[in-house]
Amino acid sequence: MPRSLKKGPFVDQHLFVKVDRENEKGTKNVIKTWSRRSMIIPDMLGHTIAVHDGRKHIPVFVTESMVGHKLGEFAPTRTFRGHVKDDRKGKRR
């Protein structure tokens, strides 16, 4: 169930302050955050936000199509290494 429209989007306060400060300066430095739960708002357009995936920070360049999504959607937490191939040649009857 999506968030109620009357509540508005959730953005962590410390992240909002960092984005607002970058917009005031007019710079586009990488903003490092652990807040995967924050929603992408139009103020973040054009910024690169480094989102933590549990091990390292993944740089995410925010575009117009990402507005309304959560930051965590663009930094996967699990690495899929592929399924193990069956070794049928090794088995002899």
UniProtKB/Swiss-Prot annotation:
SUPFAM superfamilies: Ribosomal protein S19 (SSF54570). The keyword Methyltransferase does not apply. GO terms for cellular component: cytoplasm; small ribosomal subunit. GO terms for molecular function: rRNA binding; structural constituent of ribosome. One of its GO terms (biological process) is translation. The keyword DNA repair does not apply. Keywords: Ribonucleoprotein, Ribosomal protein, RNA-binding, rRNA-binding. Belongs to the universal ribosomal protein uS19 family. Protein S19 forms a complex with S13 that binds strongly to the 16S ribosomal RNA. NCBIfam families: rpsS_bact (TIGR01050). This is Small ribosomal subunit protein uS19. The gene is rpsS.
